[in-house]
Amino acid sequence: MIFLKAPRVKTAALFAAILLVVLFSSCKGKAGGFGAGRDVYERMRNTTYEVKFNFPGLERQPDHDMVIRAFNDKLTEMGYPGLSIRLDSSDWASWMDRSSALVLSGGDYDLVYAPIMTPFYADAMAGGAWLPWDSYIDLVPEFAELLAPWREYLYVWGADTKEKHIYRIPNIKEYASYRCEARWNKNVAERLGITEQLRNIKNVYEFEPYLEMYKNVYGNNGMAVLAVDSYKLVDCFMLGAFNSFLDSVYDVNTDSYLNYAFSPWFDEYIALTRSWYAKGYIPAYQQTELIDDLSMKFGPESFLVYFNEGKPGGEAEMNQNAKGRYEMGTTYLTPAFVDFNSLMGVAWGLNARSKNPEAAAFLFGLLSSNKELTNLINFGIEGVHYNLDSNGVAVRTVPSQYYSNLLWMLGNRFLCHRLPGEPENLSELYQEFNNNAVKFPNFGFQEPGEEAWKGVDRDMYKGVLGALRTQYQRSIEIGTLSDADLADIRRRLTQANYQQIDAVLNREYAAYKGSNEN
């Protein structure tokens, strides 16, 4: 087992979010702002423009149009009668498909949900499709003071020139980090009398006696381990690793970059999942079923545990998704840690082709700073799609015709209503979570520009990497790689000179550390 060794630090994200809320709230309804760029509010009051968001799947909500109309009516009430939004994804139906990255480089959208997690996506968008961060700040000068603390959280890939770098708008999230968790079925734990034992587990191996207990009681009718999330067990060995899928990844234990497929923690993960399949903890039929198909079959005691990343208050959201079939408990397997992918995985891109980027930037800021707008887009219309109970908790109507599932990626989570089961002191829990988060030594290091890669055939490497992901990604996710599969992966990566990729990253990272020592 590889354990985390990085020091603890405080993060700035929580305070940036609070600052954004306070400052924007102070100017709500006023013509002015708070500084040299205050005239932007007057311009927006006299601007007519529809800001078009591309958000995957929202148009499938039956009351989508009703909520958007209510949102635009609210903008008029706030003094911006010419501003409106449109959220759809008519040409981005398969948004998780890698080929959909090509859509991001064109189209007439002003703002696009842009979970660009790998250089593959960056290559598809290179060429100036997105406005640089500084340009976004310049569009609405008031944002400079508000959003400056977010600069260190920008994950940037791209070419050498500033114009081709991919900068994105960071979302105002409720946390700047996450931790690796085991989530377990409270119904089962209580029946087996193991609730406290599960809460006190320190690593994945300590689950085995309870997995064996579950299998002995439920046999083939249950799932001791839910396999479709088991690939996230890798994060219990090497934090952040599962996002890389065979590419180079930062190893906090050696403070260096190495390839995913050649790392000792990957071997450990493969050995563990093979063992769990052999012992019957993960039923073989899970290898052929998708999570959505399996979840439709879940009953109150269908499984014992699965693994994921999490945050404070996460149990409430999980229980809501379970729709009363079971309740979840959580065991924390790692400290909270700041991770670029987690921070920027919900970012939005501002299209350089926007006909009015100032209006788009302004409206995004408005959405992220106004409580009514944030809750409208996330919950729908109060009294229609949800009601607030006596404690101010949002209880969705049944059945609700609007369930956006945007809480984690659009709006300001600090301004959102609480969900059933979330504690009243949730903001304080977030603050504690962030204050105790680990910040890796490589935080802020960006992939080197083209000059650093001279003499390295990255196109060939990326081609091999893409082919391997297509062939083996699902096997990696569910932990079913054979010896022959693993040998094939390593042989092809070696032929593609993965060592050169690691060498360049480590050379440039060493230079980065040297330049930042003072």
What spans do the regions from the language model cover?
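Extracytoplasmic/secretory soluble proteins
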Residues: 2-4, 11, 15-518
